[in-house]
Regions:
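Aspartic protease
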Residues: 2-4, 8-10, 16-103
Length: 103
């Protein structure tokens, strides 16, 4: 049984058309989109401060040790011939660069 779905997606800085191709994890159990904070910094994505932090909880209900989500980025996401402007919450994803939730 297939447990993970990975896609090659283009991600561009908004209004700069300067992008990269990255493998993203498609997660049907998540409704939001996330980008790893180290990846966002490494590629110079512009961080936008959230008005209210988003508390992150672990599966067991405890607060995540990395703390709350306080920033997001806006990017152009490109898959095949489709381009969509999206916002992703910035957090620590470990070995995964981007998680795309199912909206």
């Amino acid at each position: 049984m297939l447990r993970e779905v990975w896609l090659d997606i283009g991600v561009e800085k908004v209004d700069m058309y300067e992008g990269i191709t990255v493998k993203v994890l498609l997660d049907s159990g998540v409704t939001e989109m996330f980008i790893d904070q180290k990846m966002a910094a490494r590629h110079g994505f512009r961080l936008q401060k959230l008005e209210r932090p988003i508390v992150v909880r672990n599966v067991n209900g405890t607060n995540n040790s990395a703390g709350a989500i306080t920033y997001q980025v806006e990017v152009n996401m490109c898959y095949k011939s489709h381009i969509e402007r999206i916002r992703m919450d910035v957090c620590n994803l470990g070995k995964t660069d981007i998680i795309l939730g199912m909206l």
